[in-house]
Amino acid sequence: MAEKITTRSADYSQWYIDLVRSAKLADYSDVRGCMVIRPNGYAIWEKMQTALDRMFKETGHVNAYFPLFIPESFIAKEAEHIEGFAPECAVVTHGGGEELAEKLYVRPTSETIIWSSYKKWIQSYRDLPILINQWANVVRWEMRTRLFLRTTEFLWQEGHTAHATPEESQEEVVRMINVYKTFAENYMALPVIIGKKTDSEKFAGAVDTWCIEAMMQDSKALQAGTSHNLGQNFAKAFDCQFQTRDGKLDYVWATSWGVSTRLIGALIMAHSDDRGLVLPPKLATRQVVIIPILKGDKAAVCEKAHAISRTLSANGIPAFVDDSEQNSPGWKFAEYELQGIPLRIELGPRDIQNGTCIVARRDTLEKTELALDDTLSVSISEILNAIQQNLFDRALEFRNEHTFEASSYSEFREMVENGFVIAHWDGTAETEAKIKEETKATIRVLPEEPDYISRYAMHEAGTCIYSGNPAAQKAVFAKAY
């Protein structure tokens, strides 16, 4: 029988761990803080990679690969950067049986090693822009880990671009955060808010950090992607100058942006239920499972099931048949619900006789009878599209229902236990830190989306809910992963 998982209402954190392990997405490693991504989990990452890689290339980016090891002298060149990452770094001190002359850092992120190459490649405005993405692993020495959400080693992509003007680099920052939003909403069925981080939350070494923030089913926030305007900070650190069109020397303008396997954690927590994983069809490697009810003429039922599978697959709908006899249909139903297969077709002798089959949706658990004729592929495709849309609509409705507006600090403290809170903030790091200390809530995002700004009057002046000082804007606060 499919493994029993803790319910969300009983213990949300344990539910998440149970689901990840029972659905065979990932497991703990013998290396502290690291995880093993199992085939079911890696298949989701591959689907994400495929979609994102296509989107990156459509916006003019190309892939490259840079070293895993970064000399200590490179890391030290950008003071703010090293200050932000030093506590998380893994450091190699010995190699080949000898102590190294210079320590090597295992990349926590690649700005420094990449900019050491960009300095060699860029001499003139004709060499710009450089639009490079890297698919890689990174290491950040986490003390408190959770599968997919926070691990010592994780997989990601990191884009690193170089530009001739600040306007071009800012356009790149906004372009790529919008690529992430499109991916999150169209593929993950995950509504997100685009905006900026506060100075205390931005990337170490960045001028500005833009992000997409999502709400999970426990009403906590999860940062799903970031895009950083690095200004000329890294170019200055590596003395990367270029000759401008008018013959002058200037430092290059830079951006970096990335998402990671953390997105799989977001996907799980946004959509899944007490039965197991719920996957948006666009990120499901296997969209349809066909389960023959093996009574009577087993051979005829299996033959029809495989014929349906071939037809669906030929029409771009990845399908497979489970006609194994060691487990009952009921066991299979539960197992494939646990694995998050979006659609199940049940097929028995009577169904074949009637020219119909039963189709069960994973998102709503509703069952429908469909005709076994030339319209089947179209009908299945329509249901898969409906599942994709329903997951997005359901998540958006949940976010809207759990977004509150606070006009006092007492109101704020109560509301922040149940979702996002929009409240006036005086713009100071002191107030931000005090609120975090007292409530564990942080400013997740300063929204930049016109619709969101308008809906919640984000730029309306008022009084800070904590300090009572004048506030020029509102911020979105939440507890977060």
From Swiss-Prot:
Per UniProt, subcellular location reads as: Cytoplasm
Sorted keywords for this record are: Aminoacyl-tRNA synthetase, ATP-binding, Cytoplasm, Ligase, Nucleotide-binding, Protein biosynthesis
The reactions it catalyses are:
tRNA(Pro) + L-proline + ATP = L-prolyl-tRNA(Pro) + AMP + diphosphate
> One GO CC annotation, please?
aminoacyl-tRNA synthetase multienzyme complex
Transmembrane annotation, as ranges: none
As for family, the record states: Belongs to the class-II aminoacyl-tRNA synthetase family. ProS type 3 subfamily.
Which protein is depicted? Proline--tRNA ligase
The species is Chlorobium phaeobacteroides (strain DSM 266 / SMG 266 / 2430)
